Amino acid sequence: MAIKGLSIPVFGRYHNKDGVVTYTDGMVNPHAVSYQISLTAGDNNPFYADNRIVENDVGMFSSGILKLETDDFTAETSKYLLGLKEVTRTYGESKTATSLVYDDTQKSPVLGYGIIEEHQINEVNKYKAVILKKVVFGIPEDAATTRGEKIDWQTKTIEGAISRSDEVNDEVSHPWKEDAWFDSEAEALAFLKAMLGVGVKGQ
C-alpha cells in the first residue's frame, strides 16, 4: 500500500447554526501539487503503577496548519480563499480592468477543504477523499523567477489554520477531519462536492 498521487482541491463556505454545520458556494480548484498537515495536540498523560504505564490519556487534537501547493491561483480562487474585494480601474483611453484589493477590510472566510489522495493497494488504485472541516487561509507569499532558456516551472503555496468544527450531534463532536475511500477519482470528487456544497447557494 502506498500513496501515488494527489488531485483536485475543493472548498466550501462554512456555516454554523447552533452546532449544525453546513457548507455552501463550493468551489473546485482543478490542480494540486502537494499538501501537508502539521498538527498540534495536547501532551500525553500516562498513569504509572507497578513501575510501568498502565493507563494513558492520549493528547487530543487542538489545532493544525495546512500547507497546500497548487500550480497557481486564479483571481477567482484568490478572491474566494482570502475574502478580497474587486474594484474596477480605468486606464488608457476608456479601458477598464478588474483589480483584487488587499486592504484593512480583507478578512479570510472560514471554509471547509477537501482533496483526493490516490493510493495503490494490492495493485489496485483507490481514492481517498480527505476533508478538513474548518480552515482559514492566510495571505500567501509572492515570488517569481524570470524565464530563461529552459522553463523553470513555479508553483504557488498557501497555508491555512485548521481548527475543530462546531458540529455536535449524535454521530460527531467537534470533528476536524474525515475521509472516505472510493474506487474511482470521479466518485471521490462527487463526494467532496456534495460534502462541501458545490452547487449549493448560500443566503
Please state what every model-predicted region is:
Residues 15, 24, 49, 92, ...:
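Compositionally biased, intrinsically disordered low-complexity regions enriched in proline and serine
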Residues 23-29, 126-134, 175-180:
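Short amphipathic beta-strand/extended segments with alternating polar/hydrophobic composition
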Residues 16, 87-93, 168-174:
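Intrinsically disordered, low-complexity coil segments
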Residues 135-203:
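Mixed-charge, glycine-accented linear interaction segment located at domain edges/termini
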Residues 6-8, 12, 67, 89, ...:
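Hydrophobic transmembrane signal anchors and adjacent membrane-proximal interface regions, especially
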